[in-house]
UniProtKB/Swiss-Prot annotation:
GO terms for cellular component: nucleus. This is Myc protein. The keyword Nucleus applies. It comes from Asterias rubens (Common European starfish). InterPro entries: bHLH_dom, HLH_DNA-bd_sf, Myc_transcription_factors, Tscrpt_reg_Myc, Tscrpt_reg_Myc_N. The lineage of its organism: Eukaryota, Metazoa, Echinodermata, Eleutherozoa, Asterozoa.
Length: 407
């Protein structure tokens, strides 16, 4: 006896909506013990059953009876009525009732066919990997062609021919999709098979080569920028010790100054000697540059050129060298000023016992002491003048007394 269509539709609707409702045991157990977040998430996924279930059949049926609904037809003889038992109208938005559907019973048996209305994720993954390999191969060929003959336009990747996939890995679309493929659209990459790791594997070779070219240009324009900044950073944290190639055959250079520790320069260095060494180094640099421009074939000039290139790679290194020399001279000047203030403090009698006198106090006391010394000098001059006059008067009196005795 044939089951009516309305009863069959109601039974299938109840079967499809059965997973949307939880049983009494699940409901009461969930109220007593709240589910973990993972269980709650999976239950939410179960509320949306996609795709519709395949028609049930007994395992003892023959191969020809696996699709009984495809052979059942209504009074009008259209096979589209049999698919309306399995899916609603909303599930088949692209089915055209004017186009005749395919009959799966007449299709040849294929080993890789899927006995369901969904694509197999494994076969889709294999097809996607083959497509990615061919895409990379075409991208490499396109990159080599573009490197040989550069062009300004951007070309889209060509479509991969179907012959490169192989017939053993493909599935007959007519065995899976019973309606025409001209009105359907199947996107393998939006069906959940694309993962972040798979998307990261796709690399555009042309853009990578452009990036390498741009990085190479930047590195060639300023090759010693990082080294110069590193030298600046090291000058603030440790004594100045720049390792250069060496002096030019016994002649002094700035490397001899920079290699000396700061404490040694403070104690033993002289300001005039440092200035003379700097002037000699500048003369050596200018003479080596002129000789390098005049005669390039000479071995001595080539060696001096190498030394200059190694010791002065860029303008930044020259600035740091000049700044280091200036700092050495400035420290020497401050040290001399400090020693002069200490000597002045020792000369003032009021500040002889004060070890921590300020510079302003030292200057004030020194000016007062100098003014007092000048007043005392003036009084002493006056006393000296009076003493000279008295001495002169005494001599005249002595001469007057001795004059009658001589006669």
């Amino acid at each position: 006896a044939r089951v009516p269509d309305d009863d069959m539709n109601s039974l299938e609707d109840s079967d499809s909506m059965e997973s949307c409702f939880a049983g009494e045991e699940e409901f009461y157990s969930s109220t007593l013990t709240p589910p973990t977040p993972s269980e709650d998430i999976w239950k939410k996924f179960e509320l949306y059953p996609t795709p519709p279930l395949s028609p049930s059949h007994n395992p003892d049926d023959k191969e020809s009876d696996r699709h009984p609904r495809h052979h059942q037809q209504d009074g009008d003889g259209s096979p589209s009525r049999s698919y309306q038992h399995l899916m609603d109208d909303d599930d088949l938005p692209l089915v055209n009732p004017q186009v005749p559907l395919l009959d799966l019973s007449s299709a040849p048996p294929i080993a890789a066919l899927i006995q369901d209305c969904m694509w197999s994720s494994i076969i889709a993954e294999e097809r996607r990997k083959l497509f990615m390999k061919s895409e990379k191969k075409h991208a490499e060929e396109r990159a080599t062609k573009k490197a040989s003959t550069p062009s300004s336009g951007v070309m889209l990747p060509p479509l991969v021919p179907a012959s490169e996939y192989g017939t053993s890995d493909c599935v007959d679309p007519s065995a899976v999709c019973p309606y025409p493929l001209s009105e359907t659209r199947l996107d393998l990459f939006s069906s959940g098979t694309n993962t972040p790791s798979d998307s990261e594997e796709e690399i555009d070779v042309v853009t990578v080569e452009k990036k390498h070219h741009s990085v190479h240009k930047i590195n060639t324009t300023r090759p010693y920028h990082k080294q110069s900044t590193k030298v600046r950073h090291q000058l603030h944290h440790r004594p100045i010790s720049v390792a250069l190639v060496g002096s030019l055959r016994g002649r002094p250079s700035t490397a001899t100054i920079l290699s000396i520790p700061i404490k040694k320069l403070k104690t033993e260095g002289n300001l005039e000697e440092v200035k003379q060494i700097l002037q000699k180094s500048n003369l050596i640099r200018s003479s080596s540059g002129s000789s390098r421009g005049s005669s390039r074939g000479c071995s001595r000039n080539s060696s001096s050129r190498r030394v200059n290139q190694v010791s002065h790679p860029s303008s930044d290194s020259e600035d740091t060298e000049k700044r280091a020399c200036h700092n050495v001279l400035e420290r020497q000047r401050r040290e001399d000023l400090r020693t002069s203030f200490l000597l002045l403090r020792d000369e003032v009698p009021e500040l002889g016992t004060c070890d921590r006198a300020a510079k302003v106090v030292i200057l004030k006391k020194a000016t007062d002491y100098v003014s007092s010394l000048r007043d005392r000098e003036e009084t002493l001059r006056m006393d000296m003048a009076t003493e000279k006059n008295r001495n002169l008067q005494l001599r005249r009196r002595l001469e007057a007394l001795l004059a009658p005795l001589t006669l």
